[in-house]
UniProtKB/Swiss-Prot annotation:
GO BP, one annotated term: rRNA processing
Gene (UniProt): rph
Protein name: Ribonuclease PH
This protein's record includes keyword Translocase: no
Self-association state and partner proteins as the record states: Homohexameric ring arranged as a trimer of dimers.
Biological role stated in the UniProt entry: Phosphorolytic 3'-5' exoribonuclease that plays an important role in tRNA 3'-end maturation. Removes nucleotide residues following the 3'-CCA terminus of tRNAs; can also add nucleotides to the ends of RNA molecules by using nucleoside diphosphates as substrates, but this may not be physiologically important. Probably plays a role in initiation of 16S rRNA degradation (leading to ribosome degradation) during starvation.
Keywords, alphabetical: Nucleotidyltransferase, RNA-binding, rRNA processing, Transferase, tRNA processing, tRNA-binding
EC number: 2.7.7.56
One Pfam family per UniProt: RNase_PH_C
Catalytic reactions of this protein: tRNA(n+1) + phosphate = tRNA(n) + a ribonucleoside 5'-diphosphate
InterPro entries: ExoRNase_PH_dom1, ExoRNase_PH_dom2, ExoRNase_PH_dom2_sf, PNPase/RNase_PH_dom_sf, Ribosomal_Su5_D2-typ_SF, RNase_PH, RNase_PH_bac-type, RNase_PH_CS
A GO molecular-function descriptor: tRNA binding
Naturally occurring in which organism (per UniProt): Corynebacterium kroppenstedtii (strain DSM 44385 / JCM 11950 / CIP 105744 / CCUG 35717)
């Protein structure tokens, strides 16, 4: 019998405690604090009544995303990237990942020529910041669309079924779900999996950091990720079952 114990004592296929708080800030149409254990991310969704040039006169909207980490999000303070005058490649990569993932959760035609800008700011990082960002951003997006529906600018069909994301990895030869930093930093294999409510994949990012992996292990990773995403989608739906957390606007042109 294996004596392997995870860094925080969880079962191999057990998620960290997940918390989703809507209405975390007052200004954006959608605002969420999402927690995966000690990882905390603020996800906001802001609405702009215009689209990028490549979408102009298309009748479709757009969704874009930006990801960043606060200087004190990690144990050692990191200077702001804006102060360095250059955004890191990792930041660009995660921003694009969040945008791609959430575009799978919205009907851009139903959005009209409006843009939803998602901002994911990591307040505290302990592994899984990109997966927490995607999971929380869906809830912020849902609230932003509720706001637009109240204004009469979009139909109720703009929001598609939930999208969530989770990390999986190989730690000391064991497939583990939802890695904290202590595990993520030494994982032999590390993956991030984005899935829809129906079990379809939006994106799979997988790297053999310190080891190769077999087809059988790949299937184990996918099974663990599917379990984790299903739990996260239940958490998203539970959060969204409550009323919109702020006062809704009056319908325009009513």
């Amino acid at each position: 019998m294996s004596d392997f114990v995870r860094a925080d004592g969880r079962a191999l296929d057990e998620m960290r405690p997940v918390r989703i708080v809507r209405g975390f800030t007052t200004n954006p149409a959608g605002s969420v604090l999402v927690e995966f254990g000690n990882t905390r991310v603020m996800c906001t969704a802001s609405v702009e009544d215009r689209v990028p040039r490549f979408k102009k006169d298309s009748g479709e909207g757009w969704l874009t995303a930006e990801y960043s980490m606060l200087p004190s999000a990690t144990a050692e303070r990191m200077p702001r990237e804006s102060m360095r005058g250059k955004v890191k490649g990792r930041t660009h990569e995660i921003s694009r990942l969040v945008g791609r993932s959430l575009r799978a959760a919205i009907d851009l035609k139903a959005l009209g020529e409006n843009t939803i800008a998602l901002d994911c700011d990591v307040l505290q990082a302990d592994g899984g910041t990109r997966t927490a960002s995607i999971t929380g951003a869906y809830v912020a997006l849902a609230d932003a669309l509720t706001y637009l529906e109240a204004e009469g600018l979009v139909s109720q069909n703009a929001l598609l079924p939930p999208v969530a994301a989770v990390s999986v990895g190989l730690i000391d030869g064991h497939v583990c779900l939802d890695l904290p930093y202590e595990e993520d930093s030494r994982a032999e294999v590390d993956m991030n999996v984005v899935m829809t409510e129906s079990g379809e994949f939006v994106e799979i990012q997988g790297t053999g950091e310190h080891s190769t992996f077999s087809r059988e292990q790949l299937m184990q990773f996918m099974d663990a990720a599917e379990k984790g995403c299903s739990e996260l989608i239940r958490a998203q739906k539970e959060a969204l079952s409550k009323p919109y957390p702020k006062r809704l606007p009056n319908r325009k042109n009513a």
